[in-house]
């Protein structure tokens, strides 16, 4: 049977199931959760909505609404403990944009789902969860000149589970973020039109381990162990000057997790 979701723009499934009666995450089984968003309707002043629904019960777990919304992106943490909703909003003039984040804590579905909010006054170009941890990072500002990267934690026993910003990595030519599968190590990259600027960052120690360049790099991939990172210039499957441009630099490089060439 179809699920009614008028005007839905995007939906994403949770990466795991949940115990909706007692709380907690179930890696094998449990109730999956569907998240989706629908845009606002100016003709009848209906705001944009983000909704979480338990399937197959079709129980609405949480709904939030926002006005003056241009775009929404849904980011599930790989372990399913959190859902980050990135909301690009405009002011009444529609000339100025800013970003709101709504972070859903998913561990206690048997209670009301807690949602944390914060605002970034500039447009965010990319958001990424740490795969094996409780941190996230995002890029904002003009990445073609000098953008910034903010690193947050969702909290642990050391700070009583409080979400807080850890620090800002300032003035980086970057438009993509690539976490190691094991967490902690992060590649801050400027791909495509930024021509392959690479910085290997140690999140725990808040320090840059290495700055490198792979000219015209447009793809980055970590090996599953998190020990090796591969950067590549991949030729688009098309004809014309764009394809020829990448063909001249086609190839790959391997780096240690610290950013040393292999």
Locate the predicted segments by residue.
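Short amphipathic alpha-helices and their capping/turn residues within compact interaction modules
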Residues: 79-81, 85-88, 106, 132, ...
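Short, conserved, GDST-rich strand-edge loop motifs in beta-rich repeat architectures
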Residues: 28-43, 86-99, 141, 232-250
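Conserved beta-propeller blade repeats
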Residues: 5-27, 69-80, 116-135, 168-182, ...
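Hydrophobic beta-strand positions that form the internal "hydrophobic ladder"
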Residues: 34, 80-83, 136, 183-186, ...
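Extended repeat-based solenoid scaffolds, especially LRR ectodomains
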Residues: 50-56, 63-65, 73-74, 78-86, ...
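Multi-bladed beta-propeller domains
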Residues: 1-10, 55-70, 106-123, 155-173, ...
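Beta-propeller blade signature
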Residues: 48-56, 98-109, 150-156, 198-202, ...
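Loop/turn-rich, solvent-exposed surfaces of beta-rich toroidal or solenoidal domains
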Residues: 172-203, 207, 211-240, 244
């Amino acid at each position: 049977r179809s699920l009614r979701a008028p005007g839905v723009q995007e939906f994403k499934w949770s990466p795991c199931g949940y115990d909706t009666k007692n709380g907690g995450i179930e890696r094998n089984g449990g109730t999956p959760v569907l998240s989706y968003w629908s845009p606002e309707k100016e003709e009848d002043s209906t705001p944009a909505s983000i909704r979480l629904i338990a399937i197959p019960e079709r129980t609405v777990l949480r709904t939030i609404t926002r006005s003056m919304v241009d775009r929404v992106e849904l980011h599930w943490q790989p372990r399913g403990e959190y859902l980050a909703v990135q909301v690009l909003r405009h002011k009444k003039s529609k000339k100025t944009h800013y970003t709101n984040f709504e972070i859903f804590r998913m561990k206690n579905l048997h209670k009301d789902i807690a949602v944390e909010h914060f605002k970034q006054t500039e447009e965010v170009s990319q958001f990424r969860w740490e795969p094996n941890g409780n941190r996230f990072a995002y890029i904002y500002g003009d990445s073609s000149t000098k953008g910034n990267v903010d690193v947050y934690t969702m909290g642990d026993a050391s700070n009583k589970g409080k979400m807080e910003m850890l620090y800002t990595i300032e003035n980086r030519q970057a438009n993509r973020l690539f976490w190691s599968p094991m967490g902690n190590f992060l590649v801050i990259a400027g791909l495509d039109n930024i021509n392959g600027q690479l910085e290997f960052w140690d999140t725990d120690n808040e320090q840059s381990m290495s700055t490198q360049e792979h000219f015209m790099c447009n793809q980055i991939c970590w090996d599953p162990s998190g020990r090796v990172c591969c950067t590549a210039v991949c030729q688009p499957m098309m004809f014309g000057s764009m394809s020829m441009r990448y063909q001249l630099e086609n190839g790959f490089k391997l780096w240690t997790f610290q950013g040393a060439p292999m």
